[in-house]
Amino acid sequence: AGQNTES
């Protein structure tokens, strides 16, 4: 699974 964290 790919985890994308951008706020």
Curated annotation (Swiss-Prot):
Molecular-function GO terms, alphabetical: enzyme inhibitor activity
Domain of life of the native organism: Eukaryota
Keywords assigned by UniProt, alphabetized: Copper, Metalloenzyme inhibitor
Function as written in the Swiss-Prot or TrEMBL entry: Binds one copper ion per molecule but does not bind the galactose oxidase apoenzyme. It may inactivate the enzyme by binding to its prosthetic copper group.
Name under which the protein is recorded: Galactose oxidase inhibitor
